[in-house]
Amino acid sequence: MRSEQEMMDIFLDFALNDERIRLVTLEGSRTNRNIPPDNFQDYDISYFVTDVESFKENDQWLEIFGKRIMMQKPEDMELFPPELGNWFSYIILFEDGNKLDLTLIPIREAEDYFANNDGLVKVLLDKDSFINYKVTPNDRQYWIKRPTAREFDDCCNEFWMVSTYVVKGLARNEILFAIDHLNEIVRPNLLRMMAWHIASQKGYSFSMGKNYKFMKRYLSNKEWEELMSTYSVNGYQEMWKSLFTCYALFRKYSKAVSEGLAYKYPDYDEGITKYTEGIYCSVK
């Protein structure tokens, strides 16, 4: 596998020798000092160019970056409509395991880019001295934020209401429907509540990472095992068990948050739990 320095040299050398490229930035985890580096981090590179369309005429210019296993062009797909406006991106996995997420951005949109980026940006090349201020990468935008009373109640409401869809799916023997609601809505709100609880103890000055990937750092072995058990969805009994464990965990953490922030704890916890137990007893 080529080293980070080798890859960066390739990206910058290409940019230096192409007059269409005026500005180069690095984004994402490679700019975040709070994330330990590893070989699986993408190279999130943006080229700010004078003519995007000229690059799109063919893909031969991409060969300089290395031999690739696969390439995706998200803005050139029919099933998944593009979302980047005038931007155009390439996601490339190379044979040596390196991965590039390269975005072409019209140079005229650079000002908007810097005004609206997520903070994890490092300027690698600025041919025209466009940036006249210091750009320091930080992940502050992803720090856990103290919930308002309304946000706390919304999370509780969403968790308990959507859990009834899981119950309905299991009662109807529609396990894929149940699994989808557990995975996509119920558990994410459990994770949100757990993150709020942890931040209330540690301070609201850190990020849990994408998909709460750093949560294990803040849990005991027992707490982690309990959370992991909710991912067991291999059959109806396992699903019921996972759902009831989600209930117990959500109750534990949401009560802790409500007490710590002096927020009202919702009264529908008890009612939904009894409803679920009744349905479970009728179908098991």
Swiss-Prot record:
<dbReference type="GO" id="GO:0070566">
    <property type="term" value="F:adenylyltransferase activity"/>
</dbReference>
<keyword id="KW-0808">Transferase</keyword>
<dbReference type="GO" id="GO:0005737">
    <property type="term" value="C:cytoplasm"/>
</dbReference>
<comment type="function">
    <text>Mediates bacterial resistance to streptomycin. Adenylates streptomycin on the O-6 residue. Adenylates streptidine on the O-6 residue. Does not act on spectinomycin, neomycin-B or kanamycin. Specific for ATP and GTP nucleotides incorporating a purine ring. No reaction with CTP or UTP.</text>
</comment>
<dbReference type="InterPro" id="IPR043519">
    <property type="entry name" value="NT_sf"/>
</dbReference>
<dbReference type="Pfam" id="PF04439">
    <property type="entry name" value="Adenyl_transf"/>
</dbReference>
<keyword id="KW-0963">Cytoplasm</keyword>
<dbReference type="GO" id="GO:0071239">
    <property type="term" value="P:cellular response to streptomycin"/>
</dbReference>
<dbReference type="InterPro" id="IPR007530">
    <property type="entry name" value="Aminoglycoside_adenylylTfrase"/>
</dbReference>
<keyword id="KW-0548">Nucleotidyltransferase</keyword>
<protein>
    <recommendedName>
        <fullName>Aminoglycoside 6-adenylyltransferase</fullName>
        <ecNumber>2.7.7.-</ecNumber>
    </recommendedName>
</protein>
<dbReference type="GO" id="GO:0042803">
    <property type="term" value="F:protein homodimerization activity"/>
</dbReference>
<comment type="subunit">
    <text>Homodimer.</text>
</comment>
